[in-house]
């Protein structure tokens, strides 16, 4: 095991960050016990939102399913505690309408933000809504479905933070930030292997979407509370996106959660955990933790580069993490083993999606005034 640690710099910002985090752990947020907690998840298409939702709903229990008796092409998933709404349902233009107007599905003029705001607000207030359905098969907007107000509402899609009215309704914001290289590798794998698309058609699709992605989707990440950033590995040359370097970027100063840390809060840590307690074949594993800035805001960053060989050995890494919001020792490892068939289970995407899911639970419990004991 290789380990290097740099103690916090002797400056007010490092010490005040640690002190503030400790003080917040005793904070109880006053809120209406019956109010729906609303979570926003932003990302481009094909960036792992569906897998993340499956991991998160698994933490709360129950199997997500479409609304009972509804449209078989519904995008909504309902489980015991959560309802997940796909914001594609608020397209105001169907596929042909976008083609006629010459706009992509990412363009603001293709969204009904007024309806999105009114319905998310109503659900947060405990009311039911009749929500439209965007049919991804036909490209049409289908008849609406009735959605009841759940304990936890997740709105996921391209624009959850774009409209300021909607953003102000959110109790917690998450962004999946996938680098262009990885996104391209994933899209080739999915669309060529699973959908029979040609390489040229994939390149053309990516090129057509990129201007709107850069203008309307990517800027939302500066407003997120937590960001899962997926980058190419730095361990070995890899142009196929087989190995990933994943960073969990956590804003400091939140009243809703305490950032996770490795070994020592506020320090800068570089750790190679491979050895007797963690099997590491090619290309190995390297972890990092330390302070940084994100669009001018102070953040803590936890990073994993490489992949696990044996998920049950993840307990060794978990034992060195603090403020994970786990209810008991080994809960992260248990969740990872439970969902081992999900994409990303052997690398940092699965690990950090699981941790963020636990943070969502912490946010919910703080708002409804339940006791949370940090681990």
UniProtKB/Swiss-Prot annotation:
Keywords: ATP-binding, Calvin cycle, Chloroplast, Disulfide bond, Kinase, Nucleotide-binding, Photosynthesis, Plastid, Transferase, Transit peptide
Pathway named in the protein's UniProt entry: Carbohydrate biosynthesis; Calvin cycle
Record-listed E.C. numbers: 2.7.1.19
Family: Belongs to the phosphoribulokinase family.
Cystine pairs: 47-86
Catalysed reactions, semicolon-separated: D-ribulose 5-phosphate + ATP = D-ribulose 1,5-bisphosphate + ADP + H(+)
InterPro entries per record: P-loop_NTPase, PRK, PRK/URK
SUPFAM superfamilies: P-loop containing nucleoside triphosphate hydrolases
Species in which this protein is naturally found: Chlamydomonas reinhardtii (Chlamydomonas smithii)
Transit peptide residue numbers: 1-31
Coarse class of the protein's main subcellular location: plastid
Enzyme class: transferase
PROSITE patterns linked: PHOSPHORIBULOKINASE
Protein name, per record: Phosphoribulokinase, chloroplastic
Activity control summary: Light regulated via thioredoxin by reversible oxidation/reduction of sulfhydryl/disulfide groups.
């Amino acid at each position: 095991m290789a380990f290097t640690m740099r103690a916090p710099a002797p400056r007010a910002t490092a010490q005040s960050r640690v002190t503030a985090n400790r003080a917040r752990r005793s904070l109880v947020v006053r809120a209406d016990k019956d109010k729906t907690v609303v979570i926003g998840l932003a990302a481009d298409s094909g960036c792992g939102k569906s897998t993340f939702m499956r991991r998160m709903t698994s933490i709360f229990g129950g199997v997500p399913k479409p609304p009972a008796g509804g449209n078989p092409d519904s995008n909504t998933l309902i489980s015991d505690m959560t309802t997940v709404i796909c914001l594609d349902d608020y397209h105001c233009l169907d596929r042909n309408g976008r083609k006629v107007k010459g706009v992509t599905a990412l363009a603001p003029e293709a969204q009904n933000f007024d309806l999105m705001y009114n319905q998310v607000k109503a659900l947060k207030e405990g009311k039911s809504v009749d929500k439209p359905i965007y049919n991804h098969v036909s490209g049409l907007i289908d008849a609406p479905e009735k959605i009841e107000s759940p304990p936890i509402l997740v709105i996921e899609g391209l624009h959850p933070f774009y409209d300021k009215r909607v953003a102000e309704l959110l109790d917690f914001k998450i962004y999946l930030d996938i680098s262009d290289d990885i996104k391209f590798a994933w899209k080739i794998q999915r669309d060529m292997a699973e959908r029979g698309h040609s390489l040229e058609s994939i390149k053309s699709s990516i090129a057509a979407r990129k201007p709107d992605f850069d203008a309307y989707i990517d800027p939302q990440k500066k407003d997120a509370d937590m960001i899962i950033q997926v980058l190419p590995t730095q361990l070995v040359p890899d142009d196929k996106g087989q190995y990933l370097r994943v960073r969990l970027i956590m804003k400091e100063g939140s009243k809703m959660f305490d950032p996770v840390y490795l070994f020592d809060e506020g320090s800068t840590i570089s750790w190679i955990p491979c050895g007797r307690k963690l099997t590491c074949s090619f290309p190995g594993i390297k972890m990092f933790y330390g302070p940084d800035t994100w669009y001018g805001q102070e953040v803590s960053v936890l990073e994993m580069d490489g992949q696990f060989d044996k998920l049950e050995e993840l307990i060794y890494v978990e034992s060195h993490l603090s403020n994970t919001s786990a209810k008991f020792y080994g809960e992260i490892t248990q969740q990872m083993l439970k969902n081992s068939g999900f994409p990303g289970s052997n690398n940092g995407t699965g690990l950090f999606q699981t941790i963020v899911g636990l943070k969502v639970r912490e946010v919910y419990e703080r708002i409804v005034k339940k006791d949370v004991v940090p681990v």
